[in-house]
Design a protein with these regions (language model features):
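Interdomain helical linkers/hinges and coiled-coil/dimerization scaffolds
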Residues: 1-95, 120-180, 185-186
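Catalytic core regions of nucleotide second-messenger enzymes
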Residues: 73-78, 105-115
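Soluble C-terminal extramembrane regulatory/interaction domains of multi-pass membrane proteins
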Residues: 94-95, 99-107, 179
């Protein structure tokens, strides 16, 4: 994908013509089950002095190894890395596995800050909004966590071992019922 087109899309949410949108969806491998993973900017990591290109190649390879297939990996202009994770069927087992793989990726990348993982989005048009929510919420992330889960406009503090029913948790979070989500996390 053309870097300037992707950057313009992330900033404005405008993906261009229907043909351009279709091409972008194909190149990002979008399915009905997409999740955004935001990896913090390089300058915010301790002791990392790797060029942007090399860093992006290394992250892309770690992502491929962690999730077992190629995912869309993109280096934003502010230095964070955006990864579009896709699932085949969006089953609870797939989602829990994705969360575990994301926590493992945190260790492989030797991150000092948490990764931000969004809830599900289904359309290309939603990507820009999800990206900005993740980017804005990164400043408020819990530094003691490997992964912070973004739900709507708030971060949810959970680890994959706390999730007994990811589908039910997603339902609570999407409907704004944070109290029920917290009680589910406590189970």
């Amino acid at each position: 994908l053309d870097h300037s087109r992707v950057e313009a899309f992330l900033k404005t949410g405008a993906a261009g013509t229907a043909e351009e949108q279709k091409k972008m969806c194909e190149q990002m491998h979008l399915t009905d089950y997409n999740y955004l993973l935001l990896i913090p900017a390089q300058e915010r990591q301790a002791e990392t002095h790797v060029g942007e290109e090399l860093r992006l190649m290394m992250i892309a390879e770690q992502v491929r190894q962690s999730y077992g297939r190629t995912q869309f990996v993109y280096n934003t202009t502010e230095g964070s890395v955006l990864v579009v994770l896709t699932l085949d069927k969006g089953t609870e087992a797939e989602q829990v596995q994705m969360c575990r793989q994301t926590e493992a990726l945190h260790g492989l990348l030797e991150m000092t800050e948490p990764l931000i993982l969004s809830g599900r989005f289904t359309r290309l048009e939603q990507l820009s909004s999800v990206y900005w929510q993740a980017r804005n919420m990164a400043a408020y992330s819990d530094r003691t966590q490997k992964v912070c889960y973004l739900s709507g406009e708030s971060l949810v503090r959970v680890t994959t071992t706390d999730i007994t029913s990811l589908e039910r948790l997603n339902e609570y979070l999407l409907s704004g019922r944070a109290q029920e989500a917290q009680s589910l996390i406590g189970e």
